[in-house]
């Protein structure tokens, strides 16, 4: 029960850290704070954010498995990576868009999740951008 509560709190904080920068990026094409979202992914996965975002998709999923929380956070991470990819694509940065989408798809395959489905922590965000 304590682990479940701890994980729920981590996911809540993750969603809070991601929501505003993703909203600004979607609404205004403002990528200035997208690094905060990428840092939040690293923190959630208990990895150095700079290293985490540079990992090849297969390496990222391996590290998530080794951390032992991959199954518990995979949908949320894949969902956020897909949004980052979409924002990069909208602003013409195809290289970063492709990298983030590849990471999201690898997570979805490795952990049998669907990053296109909105996790409950992001429902309010999803409603504001649609």
Task: Kindly label every feature range from the protein language model.
Residues 1-74, 109, 128-130:
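N-terminal alpha-helical interaction modules that lie
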Residues 20-21, 40, 77, 84, ...:
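Structural register within alpha-helical repeat arrays
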Residues 24-25, 81, 88, 108:
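Residue at a conserved register position within TPR or TPR-like alpha-solenoid repeats
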Residues 29-30, 93, 100:
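Residues in the short coil linking paired helices within alpha-helical repeat scaffolds
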Residues 63-97:
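Charged low-complexity stretches with an acidic bias
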Residues 73-76, 80, 117-125:
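The tetratricopeptide repeat
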């Amino acid at each position: 029960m304590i682990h479940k509560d701890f994980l729920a709190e981590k996911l809540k904080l993750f969603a809070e850290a991601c929501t505003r920068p993703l909203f600004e990026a979607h609404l205004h094409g403002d990528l200035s704070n997208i690094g905060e979202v990428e840092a939040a992914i690293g923190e959630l996965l208990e990895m150095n954010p700079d290293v985490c975002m540079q990992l090849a998709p297969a390496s990222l999923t391996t590290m998530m498995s080794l951390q032992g929380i991959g199954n518990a956070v995979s949908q949320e991470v894949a969902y956020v990576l897909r949004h980052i990819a979409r924002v990069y694509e909208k602003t013409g940065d195809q290289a970063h868009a492709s990298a983030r989408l590849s990471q999201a798809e690898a997570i979805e395959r490795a952990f049998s999740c669907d990053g296109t489905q909105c996790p409950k922590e992001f429902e309010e965000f999803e409603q504001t951008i649609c």
